[in-house]
């Protein structure tokens, strides 16, 4: 449940939503995807209300293991998006090959999910989303279950993909540093005893140079300052 909230995500922007479990992060994301209808208010994409799922919007789930079909190969899992989108069969191999190259999985096209590491499985899910050529990418804690080194590698890969494809991203995370590293803006909720229902309490601009780099960006004085500011804010709310 979310209190009345107004959030605007601009075209080509990377916006992170951060907060503890139960603060409404996933509800906001699911409403943006058209998976659920808000009980009040509206969700708009451009000037049009979101009435349901759209090919222009792709959703990356946290649980990559359940998002992939174990009896389909990597290429077969990516083909799902093309089949659902009505892409002619003759055009699918080229589209699949292109996104596999984009995420660096060309050599694994005929492997099954169980033969891949967690990070590689998540890249398959991202590749499947890219295959549908979306304008908006919604991501629900996609790297939360991965080890630190894999998570940082995929963060950098995601930033490269977003920049090269001109995607708009709404990214949910509970990791404060991940939000600051990836985002152009960070949305923080108001929770705690003074909030009957979670609501958006702060939207923080992340004024850090791009391209970003794991060590340099995290040691940047602005990053350190924003981390302290956001940590103190979340601690109070």
PLM region descriptions:
Residues 112-116, 120:
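Conserved ABC ATPase signature
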Residues 131-135:
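A short, proline-enriched helix->beta-strand linker immediately N-terminal to the Walker B motif
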Residues 18-20:
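The feature captures the beta-strand-to-loop junction immediately N-terminal to the Walker
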Residues 33:
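Helix-to-loop junction immediately C-terminal to a conserved catalytic motif
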Residues 83, 90-108, 160:
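Conserved ABC ATPase "signature" region
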Residues 41-53:
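Conserved ABC transporter NBD signature motif
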Residues 137-140:
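Catalytic Walker B motif of ABC-type/P-loop ATPase nucleotide-binding domains
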Residues 72-83:
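Q-loop/switch helix immediately C-terminal to the Walker
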